Amino acid sequence: MKIFRQKMHESRNAERGRIMKKTYAKLMTAVMAAASILPAVPTAADETAESTLNVAIGSQFTTFDPALNTETANNYVLNHLYAGMFRKDADGNVQNELCESYEVSDDGLTYTFHISPDAKWSDGQQVTANDFVYSYLRALSYGADNAWAINDFVNFIEGAEEYSTAAQEEGESFDCTTADHSLVGIEAADDQTLVLKLKAPCAYLTGLMCANAWLPVREDFAVQHDSLWAFEGDYPTTGPYTLTECNETEKAVVDKNENYLNADDVTMDEITFLCMADKDAQALAYQTGEIDVALGISTDTALNYEGTDELWMVPKSSNYYLAINSAETGPEWAKNVDVRRALALAIDKESLVDVLGGDSFYPVLNGFVPEGVAGDTDTFRAEGDADGYTLTYDPDQAKELLAGAGYDESNPLHITYKYSNNGIHGDVATMLQQMWEAVGVEVDFECVESGVYYDQLDQGDFEICRYGYSAEDSPIQFLEMWTTGMQVVPAVNDEKFDQMIEDARQISDRSEYMKALHEAEDYLVEENVYVIPLLNFNDPALVQTYVEGQTMNGIYPYFAYVTVTE
């Protein structure tokens, strides 16, 4: 039996500071700016609040239900509302939070978690193991809308897949509080002890448990098969804040939770998250002092602040890559690995990055798993990069491969590149077209509204397209998305790759597990060129000079320990 104990959050008392104050003239400027570009909210300089912070994000909210959410905008808020058994620190390391200690059985199949006796809900009620049991069973029986969010439960928890399937067949009449779950590996041994039984060892279970779906929710507030309650506010939470106001298209306001396990370390009393999709309006609001933090600025704005203390490059475990539909619904050319390899070799990633704004914003990515995801002894990406790559820019070899596949000036390869009409995607499309045409490929564009883009990709409606994905828990979360079973309509259909991922899931030794995932990544990217990695993401943000102490909770900005000065 392996026993794990960790200290809870180290005290951050040293980070506490004074309440922000600004001059009356600055306040009036901010108020006038707010009248034209923002919903009515407290200004960043409002001295009536004990300690407040205004943070602008780029998208509106879709849900604050932990069982349902998979979107970044929601996570900015959820990250501050809930604490789970574990959390990720700024370096991506797993730290205990509500979990005081845990044990793992010798066969790696049973995890026993002991909840801290100091863990309480915001209304003062004790956090219990049954809260976690209800939350997990509710997530498994929610319905089809959260299939992606519960993927880790289904993959690893004993009986979870069968339970979820039965719940979905019964529909909304299924009641997780009364339905038999004796065959599901989720149980409360007592009020403070949660036991999880796995169907196979999982070397990174505690990392998975940092995700939203593993957070506790209360049965008396979080109803089954519905998420409307999550926008209503005034429900108990376990994290540093509670939701006190929400308009999902405009803003969410969170106030300090005095019953949070580490409440003494929380320095910011209130945070307002503002939905501001217009990047220029967000930059203007920052300039006038109406907002303290701007998380959704353009590269051009970021370049204007380059070299200043106000520019914060937010690290993001996200990849930007090209997916090729090599399966049944794809074109004939995409089934030829030499053609796929030629398209990869024709891309000058360094030039692509330079045009987009430089590697401070978009570092080149050669493997599929991006930076920021832990490997064995280093990041997974650093370990992979150390072995080198064969798919480096080589237009001459690209031409040779195309010729060998029967494509030349008299019979050029013709492809259709699909992308969505937002962000940097149009610029990327134009540069890719130029690079591919330089090796004799004719390129047409298909630009699609962002709201329907991913639905079309899920249905296999593309030849080659841009794609992106963010995760923080394990390299396997990036790789397994291209297994046949994880795709709605497969664009990659390779039994060997499927088996490589399945075999990796069975490995309990961390070093061997990571080795197996590196081999799977090489098979996906280098050997078969099913996908073409292009870029990592670093999101540029602006932070006023009077704001100090912003950090990361996993891959999301975290402001609970911020202080503000004059």
Task: Describe each PLM feature range.
Residues 363-404, 422-425:
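Structural transition elements
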Residues 248, 399, 403-471, 539:
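Ligand/substrate-recognition segments at binding pockets and active sites
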Residues 182, 353, 444-453, 477-545, ...:
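Extracytoplasmic/peripheral linker and loop segments enriched in polar/acidic and small residues
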Residues 56-106, 236:
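N-terminal lobe/hinge region of extracytoplasmic solute-binding protein
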Residues 333-375, 428, 521-533:
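Periplasmic-binding protein-like
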Residues 541-566:
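Long beta-strand-rich cores associated with HINT superfamily self-processing modules
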Residues 90, 166-173, 181-183, 191-192, ...:
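Gly/Pro-rich hinge or "lid" segments in bacterial periplasmic/extracellular proteins
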Residues 226, 259-304, 442:
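Ligand-site clamp/hinge motif
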